[in-house]
């Protein structure tokens, strides 16, 4: 994750402040040309003493096939993917496609990448199993294909190279246990998920239900989750409908959680902010600090886990290693903005382990005044890279 200084720790290789200080013209001279051509090379990794093992030696092309790319989380994730791929001098090109939330376009994008002979393709398959035939075809055409985060079914080694994911159920469970404690085991909650049927939201819902067992927590709204497509405007519409239907909403969970606050849905309806469990965003800590400064007894509380913009790093590693003859035999270690280090994957892992960012009940919060509300506070990017990514265009 992003450090307050320009110090980053990527996949177990610590880049020192002295090395970063030299990240000028001479460093860029050793940077892949394709990376220098993306927003003047701002996302390019600093030089390392040893080429990471996952890079291999074969010259390859790399692509990220996104099912939907038009939100801040995806832009920060893309920036992290560019940064990770740029660590390998043998990567010759980078392509990013945006399915725009349209399954057929996502399929066409992937088919096009395979037809062009892209060697390593990371896929965020928002449409889930509907993407499997195209993923299988790309794999059979010779590309190393790594779907990540959203499950597509199929078999590793037969339909795609590997699947890289995270333990979404545990995220839901941790959010739920926190909410049970914060509400003293009683209250009305709703869960805002992603697209219909997405494995991420389904698994988080399982974790939430497990955490609520034996309590008086009541699940309101659509189950297993309110469909929002991870679209802030859709989230605002869903929240307005929930507010109109339910006179009491004590807690809300959300995958893309920042819009719960930034939409202004609750203040506009003259309703108190609910307690929130979700993925980290700068708006949470900064809002909490502001409200506490105004009134130390303000009831607003929240918890977040890392939004895992860094999850793509492991997917990139596996895709490149598979295409270029490398090995994923080093840990993936993330440093947060307070300088705390988190080992999110051990050598050979394909599933990352998340960690808690904020817990306002413990007065442990992240608020970076340099960043806008929508920015993640655990992205694995520098502040400058995060700001650049939020301008879009990746």
Model-identified regions with their sequence ranges:
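Bacterial N-terminal signal peptides that target proteins for export
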Residues: 2-13
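C-terminal segment of classical bacterial N-terminal signal peptides
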Residues: 18-27, 281
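Low-complexity, intrinsically disordered/propeptide-like segments
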Residues: 12-13, 22-26, 390-393
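A residue-level marker of the well-folded mature domains of exported/periplasmic proteins
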Residues: 2-3, 28-394
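Long alpha-helical scaffolds
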Residues: 14-15, 259
């Amino acid at each position: 994750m992003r450090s307050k200084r320009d110090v980053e720790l990527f996949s177990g290789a610590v880049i020192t402040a002295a090395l970063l200080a030299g990240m000028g013209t001479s460093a860029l001279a050793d940077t892949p040309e394709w990376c220098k051509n993306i927003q003047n090379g701002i996302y390019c990794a600093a030089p390392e003493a040893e080429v990471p093992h996952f890079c291999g030696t074969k010259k390859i092309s790399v692509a990220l096939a996104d099912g939907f790319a038009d939100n801040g989380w995806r832009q920060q994730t893309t920036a992290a993917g560019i940064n990770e791929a740029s660590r390998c001098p043998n990567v010759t090109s980078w392509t990013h496609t945006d399915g725009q939330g349209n399954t057929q376009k996502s399929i066409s994008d992937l088919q096009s990448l395979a037809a062009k002979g892209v060697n390593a393709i990371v896929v965020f398959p928002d449409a889930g199993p509907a993407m499997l035939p195209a993923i299988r075809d790309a794999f059979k055409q010779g590309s190393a294909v790594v779907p990540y985060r959203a499950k597509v079914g199929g078999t590793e080694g037969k339909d795609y190279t590997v699947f890289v994911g995270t333990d979404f159920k545990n995220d839901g469970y941790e959010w739920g246990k926190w909410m049970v404690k914060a509400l003293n085991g009683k209250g009305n909650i709703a869960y805002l998920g992603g697209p219909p049927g997405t494995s991420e939201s389904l698994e988080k819902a399982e974790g939430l239900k497990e955490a609520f067992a034996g309590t008086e927590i009541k699940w309101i709204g659509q189950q297993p989750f309110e469909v929002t497509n991870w679209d802030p405007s859709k989230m605002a519409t869903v929240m307005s409908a929930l507010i109109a239907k339910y006179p009491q909403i004590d807690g809300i969970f959300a995958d893309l959680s920042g819009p719960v606050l930034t939409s202004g849905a609750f203040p506009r309806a003259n309703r108190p902010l609910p307690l929130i469990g979700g993925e980290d965003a700068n708006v949470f800590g900064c809002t909490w600090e502001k409200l506490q400064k105004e009134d130390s007894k303000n009831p607003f509380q929240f918890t977040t886990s890392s939004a895992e913009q860094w999850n793509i790093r492991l997917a990139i590693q596996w895709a490149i290693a598979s295409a270029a003859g490398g090995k994923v035999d080093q840990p993936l270690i993330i440093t947060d903005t307070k300088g705390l280090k988190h080992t999110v994957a051990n050598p050979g892992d394909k599933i990352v382990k998340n960690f808690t960012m904020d817990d306002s009940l413990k007065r442990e919060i992240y608020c970076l005044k340099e960043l806008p509300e929508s920015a993640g506070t655990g992205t694995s990017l520098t502040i400058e890279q995060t700001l650049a990514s939020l301008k879009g265009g990746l």
